[in-house]
Regions:
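Active-site neighborhood of HAD-like aspartate-dependent phosphohydrolases
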Residues: 1-33
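Conserved phosphate-coupling serine/threonine residues in phosphotransfer and NTP-handling enzymes
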Residues: 4, 103-105
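Short beta->alpha linker loops
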Residues: 11, 35-39, 66, 80-84, ...
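An amphipathic alpha-helix signature
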Residues: 13, 17, 37-45, 64, ...
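Helix-loop "lid/cap" segments that line or gate small-molecule binding pockets
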Residues: 17-20, 41-55, 113, 145
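Short helix-capping segments at alpha-helix termini
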Residues: 22-25, 51-55, 95, 117-121, ...
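Metal-dependent phosphoesterase signature
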Residues: 48-87, 95
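Asp-based, Mg2+/Mn2+-dependent phosphohydrolase catalytic module
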Residues: 90-93, 106-220
Length: 220
């Protein structure tokens, strides 16, 4: 969701910097980049390590709650779509393609985002705090595929981050990579595109067939 469908990473920049100021420090660009696509827990660990703070669980939980409340207020002011994202979702829905939103964002904040962009696009939604292990573990994608009644290998993931791409691949799904703020390395089961505006339903079907074929050709 963040950085794939909506241009929310800039809002996360604002809230992350505000949190660090509240904690008495400054977040370096390198540390911020390392948090992109991360779970709430991993982000807090990175922030506390960056600021040299003791990673006390209660303090990190309070910081996470503050961060998500602040970010939610920014989300509710309006989330800008990334180029081509809304149009592609509408085409997929019209074509009858079931869609799952798979995000490391917590459920409470995801609901605030869905209030802004519309939840009607998605057949199912899976959030980072609803699985045992968030991305880069495969759990979120495996859960989404299960809810859709599919195997993950029957699904095509669209991701913008190293973390999300790793999660999709670990689940067995080929990936369309649309890099946003962080470069994502290439791979045999990844198709890089510069923007979702380049894609329509037939393009996605062709990419899925191509990447799935490459996976089938790999030695056991």
């Amino acid at each position: 969701m963040d950085g794939t469908l909506v241009d929310s990473e800039k809002l996360w920049d604002v809230s992350m910097n505000a949190l660090c100021a509240r904690l008495g420090g400054v977040l370096s660009p390198e540390a911020r980049e390392a948090t992109v696509g991360g779970s709430s827990e991993s982000v807090m660990r990175a922030v506390y390590a960056e600021l040299g703070l003791e990673p006390e669980p209660a303090a990190m939980a309070e910081s996470a709650d503050w961060l998500h409340d602040y970010t939610g207020e920014l989300f509710e002011a309006g989330l800008p779509w990334l180029p081509g994202a809304q149009e592609l979702l509408e085409k997929l829905v019209t074509a009858g393609v079931p869609l799952a939103l798979v995000t490391n964002t917590r459920r409470d904040l995801t609901e605030r985002a869905l209030n802004s962009i519309g939840r009607h696009y998605f057949s199912v939604t899976v959030c980072g705090d609803e699985v045992v292990h968030a991305k880069p573990a495969p759990d979120p994608y495996l859960r989404a595929a299960e809810l859709l009644g599919l195997d993950a290998s029957q699904c095509l993931a669209i991701e913008d981050s190293v973390t999300g791409t790793a999660a999709a691949e670990a689940a067995g799904a080929p990936v369309v990579v649309v890099p946003n703020d962080v470069d994502v390395p290439g791979g045999p089961h990844r198709k890089h595109v510069s923007s979702l505006s380049e894609l329509d339903v037939d393009d996605l079907r062709g990419i899925f067939a191509s990447l799935s074929g490459e996976r089938d050709e790999q030695p056991a």
